[in-house]
Design a protein with these regions (language model features):
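Strongly charged
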Residues: 98-129
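Ribosome large-subunit tunnel/peptidyl-transferase-proximal elements
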Residues: 2-95, 119-129
Length: 129
């Protein structure tokens, strides 16, 4: 056997198992996982046109981030996978916990409270019906 054949076997196995669904990921979004999930739960399983309408009129801050991310996933589906927009729907959407920025808030009598500014990683995966 040739030298380095294990890496070649692993590379071939990874190519076979590669996920071909169009997706987009937003890392280090300055919104907490809980607040992002409120918006993601509203669009999960919907077709992309309906989801864009829901996001356009949703007053939450996370909806503007997710709307931009969804448009990116739609563009990936069109350009990279050659899928038509009419048949696309949101198969998976989830938010994972990211790092937390810790800040100090001065309080009375020399005390200090910790403020945690939470981040999340938001992922949207589309598929065709």
């Amino acid at each position: 056997m040739a030298k380095g054949h294990r890496s070649q076997i692993k590379r071939e196995r990874n190519e076979q198992n590669k996920d071909t669904r169009p997706s987009a990921k937003l890392s280090y979004a300055r919104v907490s996982v809980q607040k992002a999930c409120f918006v993601l739960d509203a669009i999960r399983g919907k077709d992309v046109q309906t989801a864009l309408g829901i996001l356009a009129y949703n007053p939450r801050y996370a909806s503007s981030l997710i709307e931009k991310l969804l448009k990116s996933a739609i563009a990936n589906a069109e350009n990279n996978n050659g899928m038509s927009v009419e048949n696309l729907y949101i198969q998976e959407c989830y938010a994972n916990k990211g790092p937390t920025m810790k800040r100090i808030r001065p309080r009375a009598q020399g005390r200090a409270y910790r403020i945690e500014k939470r981040m999340s990683h938001i992922t949207i995966v589309l598929n065709e019906r």
